[in-house]
Amino acid sequence: MSIKAFIFDLDGVLTDTSDYHYRAWKRLADELGIPFDRQRNEALRGVSRRRSLELLLDGRPATEAQMEEWMERKNRYYVESLEGLTPDDLLPGALDLLREIRRAGLKVGIASASKNTRTVLDHLNLWPLADAVSDGYSVERTKPAPDLFLHLSLIHI
């Protein structure tokens, strides 16, 4: 069987948006009067937005309505901060590798648990190099479940 496609995770493989997330969580924490620094932020990496907020609150009481509002606010801050994201924020070698794969006639799939994947791809100008995208809207279960990758295989990537 020959290789027909490559599937890439977005964050940490093609780009690194961790600082954008940190600044959004920091802004929310400051508004809520909760101490928050980069060391505390490390516990939020790779964790869902809800679980991240629970870790940020560290046992402080909150209603479901507050939780929803704070998660939405953090995401809004994050998306606003992405306005500064450009193709220069691709990790070294990522663009060259994607172009080489396409020149070889192979397909490229991008899999990310984020529901902001499409916004990130817009700012990185990666749409011309992606044959298919699977994101947090594409599947019910995201990582560590394999559904993002299985979704791409189902659409023949």
Predicted regions and their residues:
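Active-site neighborhood of HAD-like aspartate-dependent phosphohydrolases
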Residues: 2-42
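A short, structured active-site edge motif that brings together acidic residues
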Residues: 40-45, 128-142
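A metal-dependent, Asp-based hydrolase signature
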Residues: 46-81, 95, 99-100
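Short, acidic loop-to-helix structural element flanking the phosphoryl-transfer center
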Residues: 80-110
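Conserved phosphate-coupling serine/threonine residues in phosphotransfer and NTP-handling enzymes
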Residues: 112-114
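Short loop-to-alpha-helix "cap/lid" segments that border enzyme active sites
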Residues: 143-153
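Conserved small/polar residues in nucleotide/adenosyl-binding loops
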Residues: 155-157
